[in-house]
Amino acid sequence: MGKIFYEEMPVCFNARELGYANAYDVRKAAYLSVFAGAWGHTYGCGPVIFFGDKGSNFFANLHGWKEGLDFTAANEMKYLRMLIESRPMLDRVPDQGILMNKGSCGAERIQATRGKDYAFIYSAYGRDIAIKANAITGTKLNANWYDPRTGKTTFIGSFDNKQQLIFTAPLPTASPVPSQREDWVLILDNALKNYAMPGDKH
C-alpha cells in the first residue's frame, strides 16, 4: 500500500523553502506506486489530519479541514481506480521491460504496468514514451491518452505491434510552454479485445 504525500502538507515539513505538496505531487505518488506493484494507495490531506480550521495548526496553514474535503487530488483519486478497474486486474504486473526509455526518478519517471493484452504507462512529466515491439499480445494495438486530472481519454490511433512505437504526450492545455509539462497515462490495448475506456460501461 502506497502512502507518500499528503495534499497541502509542508514538503519535508519545510514549507518556507520547499512549499506545500500539491495535487500533482499526490497524483504522481499514487500512479507511480500502483503501477510499480502496490496493491493500493492511501490518499491523505494535511488540513483533515487534525480537523483544524485554517491557521489552527501546522497542517492547516492554508485551508481548513472542510475545504480540504474537496481538494483537487481528493477528487482525482477516483480516476486512478477507474483506470485500474477498466481492465483485468489479476494478471497485471509492473513491467519496465516493455519500455525503450524509463526516465530517471521523480518527475522524469516513466512507469509501466501491463496485463497480457493491455498496458498502462505513466509519464510523470509528459515525456515521450517509447514502447518495444510485441509488448503485449495482438497484431494491432489501439492507443489512447488518459488524463489523470479528468479521467477522459483521447484516441491516438491503431498501430502495428511488430515495431517500436513512440508516443508524444499532449502539451498542457492551460499553459502550452515546453518547460511546463503535465503527467499523462498511455493506454495500449490489443485491438481485438475491444476494451471500453475507463468509466464507460462494458
Task: Give a label for each model feature.
Residues M1-E17:
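Glycoside hydrolase catalytic-domain groove-lining segments
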Residues F13-A15, Y24-G157, L171-H202:
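Aromatic- and carboxylate-lined catalytic core of secreted/periplasmic carbohydrate-active enzymes
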Residues T168:
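Residue-level detector of conserved, well-ordered beta-strand and adjacent loop positions
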